[in-house]
Every structure is written in C-alpha cells, then in structure tokens.
C-alpha cells in the first residue's frame, strides 16, 4: 500500500498532463503530493525524511511550474534531486567513510564493507546517470517526451538498477541458510 501511494501523484500528473496541460498537471501533482503526505502521516504515524524532502521539492517546483505555466521548473527538480542524492552518497562514502546504503539497509543485510562501498557507488552512479539523461531529454526532446520519461523512464531505470543491485547482493548472501554475520562465502 505504501509503495502504491508513492506512485499516485506521478500517475495523476501524467494523466492530467495528457488531458489538460502543464499548469493543470502541476497543480494536480502538488495537491496529490500534499494528500499523500497527509495520508502517510495519518495511516503510518510518521513520514520518512526522504519523503518529506521529495514532497517539499515537488511542492516548490510544482508551484513554480503552475504559476509560470512552464515545465522547466519540474525538469530542474528532477535534475537537482538526482544530483543531490548522488552528492550525498558520495560525500558519505568519501568524506565520512560510511556508505549511506549500509545505513539504510545494514539492519536487513550483512555484507562485507567492500560490497557496501560498491553498492553505494553504484547508486551514486545511477543518480548521476538519471540526472544526465534528464538534462539531455529536457533540452533536446519535446516536452511530451520529457513527461513520458519522467513518468515511466525513471521508473524503468530504477527497476533495472534495483535488479542489478539484487544480483550483486545475492552473491554475498549465505548459501546454506545460516545467518553469517560477515556475509562472506
């Protein structure tokens, strides 16, 4: 239910854009995002920090898009958010010597430090690629192509990155059903 709720604002944005246009779609996106946060708070008692950041960015850039009737503000949001995610992952790894992915998943998975570092770098690279693809599409393709990319392309890229991560992690999982703490074979 929680994951489905994450996609509702995006789906409503896409449908409204196709039926109405940029301004209407941005307004629907902002309202749906605010409702999403209210529902999450009501149903689960809390909203995760990442969701608050994303919702704030959607509201800010969505309102700019609606006010100016110009999609470039939402295009900037995608670029900025992906860039920030990449920077945070890289700074955590190289400045603080702590792969952020380990902080997020370390309770569920036991992996060697080298694997956490590789996974963290992989996701940083993923966010950089998303940022660069977004810049390319927003500057060189039609507005409609960008909306399609934003609605489905990034989701597809995320699914592929998740599968690659899963395949990478699988090699470190215990093969005999034991709960090895070091994650080594």
UniProtKB/Swiss-Prot annotation:
Cellular localisation: Cell inner membrane
One Gene Ontology cellular component annotation held by this UniProt entry: plasma membrane
Subcellular location, principal: membrane
Transmembrane annotation, as ranges: 27-47, 53-73, 76-96, 118-138, 149-169
Its membrane topology: Multi-pass membrane protein
Keywords, ordered alphabetically: Cell inner membrane, Cell membrane, Membrane, Transmembrane, Transmembrane helix
Function: Plays a role in cell envelope biogenesis, maintenance of cell envelope integrity and membrane homeostasis.
Assigned protein family: Belongs to the YciB family.
NCBIfam families: ispZ, PRK00259.1-2
Official protein name in the record: Inner membrane-spanning protein YciB
Organism: Haemophilus influenzae (strain PittGG)
């Amino acid at each position: 239910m929680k994951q489905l709720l994450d996609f509702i604002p995006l789906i409503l944005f896409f449908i409204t854009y196709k039926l109405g246009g940029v301004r209407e779609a941005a307004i629907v996106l902002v309202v749906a995002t605010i409702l999403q946060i209210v529902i999450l708070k009501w149903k689960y008692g809390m909203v995760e920090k990442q969701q608050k950041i994303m919702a704030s960015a959607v509201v800010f850039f969505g309102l700019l898009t609606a006010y100016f009737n110009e999609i470039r503000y939402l295009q900037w949001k995608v670029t900025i958010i992906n860039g920030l995610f990449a920077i945070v992952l890289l700074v955590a790894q190289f400045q603080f010597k702590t792969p952020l992915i380990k902080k997020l998943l370390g309770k569920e998975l036991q992996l060697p430090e080298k694997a956490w570092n590789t996974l963290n770098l992989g996701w940083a690279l993923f966010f950089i690629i998303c940022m660069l693809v977004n810049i390319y599409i927003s500057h060189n393709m039609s507005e409609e192509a960008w909306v399609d990319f934003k609605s489905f392309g990034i989701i597809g890229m995320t699914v592929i990155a998740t599968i690659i991560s899963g395949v990478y992690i699988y090699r470190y999982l215990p093969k005999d059903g034991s709960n090895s703490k070091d994650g080594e074979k």
